[in-house]
Each structure stands twice: as C-alpha cells, then as structure tokens.
UniProtKB/Swiss-Prot annotation:
This is Large ribosomal subunit protein bL17. One of its GO terms (biological process) is translation. One of its GO terms (molecular function) is structural constituent of ribosome. It comes from the Bacteria. Part of the 50S ribosomal subunit. Contacts protein L32. Keywords: Ribonucleoprotein, Ribosomal protein. Belongs to the bacterial ribosomal protein bL17 family.
Length: 141
C-alpha cells in the first residue's frame, strides 16, 4: 500500500529526479519563469521556495546548502543577491503556478511557474550583462 508516501515519482529514478529538480530550480532562478508540465511545477515549487528562504538567511552555511542543491554558483549568487533582497519582507509564497493548456504531442497538462513580482527583463546570460551594466552605472553616479 502507498500510505504516507509523499511526492511524485514522475517515472524517474531518485537520482534522475534529484538532477532534474536541480536543473529546473537553476533555470527558474536564472530566467524567473519556466514552462513545464503541471506535476513537475507542483513538485519544484516547495524546493525553490526553500531555496529563496535560504537566500534570505544569507549566511555562508545557507549559501553552501544552496550550492549543494542546485550546483551552479552563478545562479546561487543571483538567488542570494537579487532574489532574496526582493522578497525580504514576504514570508513565503514567492512563486505562482498558472495552467497553460496542453502540450501538442502528448496532451500533457502544461503550467507556467514564475516568481511573484518577477523581473520581466530577466533573460539568463544576457541578464547578467545587463545587471552588471546597471550596477556599474549606479556606482558611477
């Protein structure tokens, strides 16, 4: 019987699930919005919410915990610098999931998962250059 078994398997091994969630969390933090299937979106939400809470804590141990989970130092830097400060006064509820119809090939239910109050201009690697340019302009002024 399946009593008391939390979480979805998503037809993957435990290691595959862990790697997939790490990659999805990194993409979500980098781009601030991703399109995925509804069950994956529902599973990734608590993972990223806990990462944002780690970012708000801001100490070295929290940063190391975040790096051990998503394994991308640049994304962790964005999480701790930009995203954590944006949600400093908010207690949870950093993400929203919106249903986005069905996928053409297999009719899987899709969802958009995004940060509430997200930066609409965030575009991954291009965004890092833009943020750096804005920081330099702010320092010069």
């Amino acid at each position: 019987m399946r009593h008391g078994k939390a979480g979805r398997k998503l037809n993957r091994t435990a290691s595959h699930r862990k790697a997939m969630f790490a990659n999805m969390a990194a993409s979500l933090i980098e781009h601030e919005q991703i399109v995925t299937t509804l069950p994956k979106a529902k599973e990734i939400r608590p993972i990223v919410e806990k990462l944002v809470t780690l970012g708000k804590r801001g100490d070295l141990h929290a940063r190391r915990q975040a790096v051990s989970q998503i394994r991308d130092v640049a994304v962790v830097a964005k999480l701790f610098d930009a995203i954590a400060s944006r949600y400093a006064t908010r207690n949870g509820g950093y993400l929203r999931i919106m249903k986005a119809g069905f996928r053409q090939g297999d009719n899987a239910p899709l969802a958009v998962i995004e940060f509430v109050d997200r930066d609409a201009d965030a575009k991954g690697s291009k965004d890092r250059a833009r943020v750096a340019a804005e920081a330099e302009a702010a320092e010069a002024a």
